[in-house]
Amino acid sequence: MNSFLKELQEKNLIQDISNIEKIENSLKNKMGIYVGFDPSAKSIHLGNFVVINVLLIAKKHRIPTVALIGGATGGIGDPSGKKSERILIDEDTLKKNTEAIKKQIKHFLPDAKIVNNSDFYKNQSFIDFLRDVGKFIQVSYMLSKEIVKNRLESGISFTEFAYSLIQANDFHYLFKNHNVGIQFGGSDQWGNITTGLELIRKRNGENSFSGGFTIKLLLKSDGTKFGKSEQGAIYLDPSLTSPYTMYQFLLNQNDSDLLNLFNFISDLGIKEILEIITKHSENPEKRYGQKMLANNIVNRIHGKNALNEVENISNILFKNGKINDLSKSEVSIIINSFEVNHVNFSNDEKIIDILDRAKIFKSKNEIRKLIEQKGLVVGAEIITDFDQILKDSNLTHGVIFARQGKKKIFIIKKS
């Protein structure tokens, strides 16, 4: 078996796969592999990082990589895996999202060929499409697809019904113009991929070297999709999800999910992954596996400097407590990662009054009890006096960090 396919199978990534012989012939003939990116959002999220990882594995095995951005199809929306009609995106948003996704792909795959399908659809008429694509795919074939069968009762528009033909045409276009022989995608893309293979077979003959496969859906042990926190999706764009938030999200993953996560989104080989899992299982409470996962992913996505910053922030917030050692940029990262309470305050006020106005405690009595128990720290100072006035030493670059115990941290910024 080809070394690329072997690595994917060793990591248990493949769900469905077409004719392996054709895929291997495609790879022997130096044909490329592609995956599509839907610009319905302005950033790729961590759950979708899996497909970038597969492209990176392909690159490692010297397979030409192609990323197709749906600048045209994004305006329609892929119905795969959806229970109802998707809301259409306006053209300006679509263009901005397309450019943002393109930039992210370039960051991880600077040598990959990036194709925007709006570039070849803008010159294709509807009549041309019916002649060049619709003529080769039977309606009965399309009706047999799960996405269509699942939506017939609730209703499916012609736009969504025809979507698989458009994606099939994408594949055929790349096959003919960019020497691409393999398409892969998420677990919900099998119907679209096989329609593309059918179009290539009909238009180019049985012996054409083309194939496809899908990647398993990355699920956590509780059955939920990976890549979303309680606050929403974990995006690769640091302006949408800070590196610190991503780091903490990965640190909080369950032991039972570690093997899957390393296989799906890290760049480590099987041997190295198993060594980490073995070492982790010796002392799970130390969370060695989670730390290695967080380090690997944050370093790859945001770089070494960002990783160093988030590690330092974590150590200060949850280990040594030296809040005043935080740099200005680290405070900025924290503000973008935590819930921040905006309150107007001055240095001649009592700390207890500022905390009360911030509404982070139920009452002043609760704050007084904490002070009596020496359980309230503001900045690096344990507060022991109900009448303690806010001092410069209680501020970190103008921000109040109030700690209740070891794990609860409240942030107050001047409004």
From Swiss-Prot:
Q: Tell me where the sequence motif 'KMSKS' region sits in this chain.
A: 225-229
Q: Which GO terms describe its molecular function?
A: ATP binding; RNA binding; tyrosine-tRNA ligase activity
* One GO CC term, this protein: cytosol
Tell me which positions the record assigns to the signal sequence.
none
- Catalyses which reaction(s): tRNA(Tyr) + L-tyrosine + ATP = L-tyrosyl-tRNA(Tyr) + AMP + diphosphate + H(+)
Which superkingdom does the taxonomy of this entry point to?
Answer: Bacteria
Report the PANTHER family cross-referenced here.
Answer: TYROSINE--TRNA LIGASE, MITOCHONDRIAL, TYROSYL-TRNA SYNTHETASE
Q: What is the protein's known function?
A: Catalyzes the attachment of tyrosine to tRNA(Tyr) in a two-step reaction: tyrosine is first activated by ATP to form Tyr-AMP and then transferred to the acceptor end of tRNA(Tyr).
Q: What is this protein called?
A: Tyrosine--tRNA ligase
